[in-house]
Amino acid sequence: MFTSEIKTYTYTNKEIQRVQILRMEDWHHISFFQPAYAEDAFRQLCDLYSNYMVKKYAYVQGTNLLFTLPDDLRLPWTNHPRYGVLYDPLCVVSAMFRDHILLRNKQLIFKNKSTEELYHQLQDRGCIHLASGKLPILSVLPVRKSFGFLSQENKDASMKVNVSFFTMNSLDIGTVYDSLATSIGLCVQRGEILNPPLFDREVFTVDKQGKTAVRRISLKDLDIRIGNKRYRDGENCRILYRPEHSYTPRHGYDLIVVGRQVTAFRRGGGLIPSSGFVIHTDILPELPDTQVRYGGLEDMLFAVQAGNSAVINGIPTNRFLSSFHDLKKPWIPPYPPTLYPLDYARDRAPRIVIGADMQDQPMILWFEGAGKYGYQPGKESCGASLKEAAEICAELGMKNGVHLDGGGSAQILCANKRELLLSDRDPVTYEENERAVVNGLIVQ
């Protein structure tokens, strides 16, 4: 079904880079899957915030209030005067906490009793966590139950690998409609769009004849259906998303979409979510349900959108061709992943690249990265820059390829075992910590 080999490269400064290379025969056996939510995933995310995020990025972090909701908590749809009709319970609670909790002298102040009671109810059930940086601001961070551990799912699978970017840090949460653990980027399987494209980043595609390419696919090129209603940009609506737009026009109506769900409906003039988009119409839309379907890529066998391209037509990509948020440009509305390293040639990290060889057969590469704690130069991999990864991919015979989510998420499991090391580590023991992810690719 596939072959796997490990190669070790030595950089000029004597640091090493280990790379796992998988080669497969065809694309028909590769499928997307979403690991089941694990209770440990929320606790691990909270630990990552407390032990790493607020320490490394302390001066751009305030007090982070992370929360998730128990399955038995029932909340009605809420017609909020500022945010509109909220259909997602996470949005309802996020709006409540944003409106009715203040931070004073690093202490939470509740404006009303109902908010305080809900907060303590969630806290008593282990659904609340606080992680504080240096800034005197409160960030309300709802956590979606849409992520889990690759190693705990489909344990008899031949191969599993992580795939998509997902919202993970406080700067990714730009509005009440956003939540952590939201998948970002196009996923297509046998003509079905599992997750919509965002931010017009590059997409690795395989058509039904097995030909691969790196191309751009925009939301504006797709049909969007809610119930029996079809929406198409420029025909009966405008499709608005970051970074082109921060707010919708004041006239008309907005359907707020994240992934495959309408999360809210409101009048125009509001913020656009950082992890979704807005269908803006002049006519009051009907909303028979909140499920969203996408069409227009039925000729695709497989497609995935995440990071920058690595190789196009056999030539390594030597610069950013896809856009990423730059913290040094605060006038541009942030969009995830907001803390993506932007030094193309020098920022080293764990990487995952998916692509095809010159015969359009699948290749997947894992570039092992330095451990967050206890890294030993020359004994462990230091990670690859985007430029270094692209050059190695081309050297190994890749024709077309793009980066998937890297960093602490990067991992390949063959027969449910890893041949390289994870970069997330325990700060005391330096043991590997598997990071929960929103989706993966699997070969049974």
Which residue stretches match the model-derived regions?
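Zymogen propeptides
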Residues: 1-273
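A generic structural motif
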Residues: 275-281, 409
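Short catalytic-site patches enriched in acidic/histidine residues
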Residues: 263, 269-276, 309, 316-319
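A short "linker-to-beta-strand initiation" element
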Residues: 210-239, 294-329
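Short, surface-exposed loop/turn motifs at beta-strand boundaries within globular domains
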Residues: 14-17, 303, 347-349
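N-terminal nucleophile
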Residues: 62, 129, 310, 351, ...
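Conserved, well-ordered active-site substructure
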Residues: 170-198, 202, 206, 317-321, ...
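Short nucleic-acid-contacting surface segments enriched for D/E, G, S/T with interspersed K/R
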Residues: 284-292
